[in-house]
UniProtKB/Swiss-Prot annotation:
Assembly mode: Part of the 50S ribosomal subunit; part of the 5S rRNA/L5/L18/L25 subcomplex. Contacts the 5S and 23S rRNAs.
Function: This is one of the proteins that bind and probably mediate the attachment of the 5S RNA into the large ribosomal subunit, where it forms part of the central protuberance.
Lineage of producing organism: Bacteria, Bacillati, Cyanobacteriota, Cyanophyceae, Synechococcales
Highest taxon of the lineage: Bacteria
Gene Ontology biological process terms from the UniProt entry: translation
GO CC list: cytosolic large ribosomal subunit
CDD domains: Ribosomal_L18_L5e
Protein name (database record): Large ribosomal subunit protein uL18
Length: 122
């Protein structure tokens, strides 16, 4: 039996996690996607099937202010602060954190902690 690749392991974990995670209007889901070069965060209402707000290292205002590589922990911290600011402006304080099958470490952890410091509760 062949060993699963890291990507396959992540996808398997994400599928298992998503069985129990669902965002509502009162408590939407903060979903994180991490690629090799960038990180993306979305606040999603699964009941209405729409994205309330989103932020990533590709955002124009964030990209201009970043002095570091977009795949770094510092960039993830900036994305966490930005998504929290956008959510708070839309009246969202409580979210469910969806790490997207990634291990809670490094860039995913940096984004989550920055969002918490900026005012989101999860």
């Amino acid at each position: 039996m062949s060993k699963l690749s890291r990507k396959q392991q992540t996808q398997k974990r994400h599928k298992r996690l998503r069985r129990n995670l669902s965002g509502t209007e009162s408590r939407p889901r903060l979903a994180v996607f991490r690629s090799n070069n960038h990180i993306y965060a979305q606040i999603i209402d699964d009941d209405a099937q729409n994205t309330i707000c989103a932020a990533s290292t590709l955002d124009k205002d964030l990209k201009a202010s970043l002095k570091v590589n977009a795949g770094s922990c510092d960039a993830s911290t900036a994305v966490g602060e930005l998504v929290a600011k956008k959510a708070l402006s839309k009246g969202i304080k409580q979210v469910i954190f969806d790490r997207g099958g990634n291990i809670y470490h490094g860039r995913v952890k940096a984004l989550a902690e920055a969002a918490r410091v900026a005012g989101l509760n999860f």
